[in-house]
């Protein structure tokens, strides 16, 4: 089961997406569908078929967002988190080979588009490093075996609590 946590920034992005889809994109596509339908035969009408499919995708996403947003818990930065890895942290880690990675621990629904530097709180990597401090070592179980990592730095977006 996915964790129903989200950062303030993630919530705002999803709310903004909902508002854009509902107030701008859906009315625009509805007009196109209405126009294409008025042309007559819909069986070979590419404009109608394509935009009707797009309208269904928009409606599906809007339904999901309307159900998801009220159920989610927004997690803002708290000074008690400082110095340890918790939800919303930007963490830089390094392994013994010197490979360095930096990412943010977020809710599963925040990982979309080109958010390659986000990992889910539900991931084995995030779970393994929770509550760890800088210079601590942690182990992640992978199909190839256990992997050792060291925490180089931990940062939080402190302004998110003020937004």
From Swiss-Prot:
The keyword Transcription regulation applies. GO terms for biological process: DNA-templated transcription elongation; regulation of DNA-templated transcription elongation. Keywords: DNA-binding, Transcription, Transcription regulation. One of its GO terms (molecular function) is RNA polymerase binding. InterPro entries: GreA/GreB_C_sf, TF_GreA/GreB_CS, Tscrpt_elong_fac_GreA/B, Tscrpt_elong_fac_GreA/B_C, Tscrpt_elong_fac_GreA/B_fam, Tscrpt_elong_fac_GreA/B_N, Tscrpt_elong_fac_GreA/B_N_sf, Tscrpt_elong_fac_GreB. Coiled coil: none annotated. PROSITE patterns: GREAB_1, GREAB_2. It comes from the Bacteria. Gene3D superfamilies: Transcription elongation factor, GreA/GreB, C-terminal domain, Transcription elongation factor, GreA/GreB, N-terminal domain. Necessary for efficient RNA polymerase transcription elongation past template-encoded arresting sites. The arresting sites in DNA have the property of trapping a certain fraction of elongating RNA polymerases that pass through, resulting in locked ternary complexes. Cleavage of the nascent transcript by cleavage factors such as GreA or GreB allows the resumption of elongation from the new 3'terminus. GreB releases sequences of up to 9 nucleotides in length. Belongs to the GreA/GreB family. GreB subfamily. This is Transcription elongation factor GreB.
């Amino acid at each position: 089961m996915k964790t129903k946590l989200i950062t303030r920034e993630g919530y705002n992005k999803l709310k903004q997406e909902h508002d854009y889809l509902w107030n701008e994109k859906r009315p625009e596509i509805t007009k196109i569908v209405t126009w294409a339908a008025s042309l007559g035969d819909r069986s070979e009408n590419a404009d109608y078929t394509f935009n009707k499919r797009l309208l269904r995708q928009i409606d599906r996403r809007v339904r999901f967002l309307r159900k998801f947003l009220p159920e989610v818990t927004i997690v803002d930065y708290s000074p008690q988190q400082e110095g340890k890895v918790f939800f919303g942290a930007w963490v830089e880690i390094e392994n013994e080979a010197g490979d360095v990675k930096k990412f943010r621990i977020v809710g599963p629904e925040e990982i979309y588009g080109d958010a390659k530097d986000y990992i889910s709180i539900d991931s084995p990597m995030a779970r393994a490093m929770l509550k760890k401090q800088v210079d601590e070592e942690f182990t992640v179980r992978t199909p190839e075996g256990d992997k050792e990592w060291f925490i180089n730095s931990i940062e939080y977006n402190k302004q998110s609590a003020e937004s």
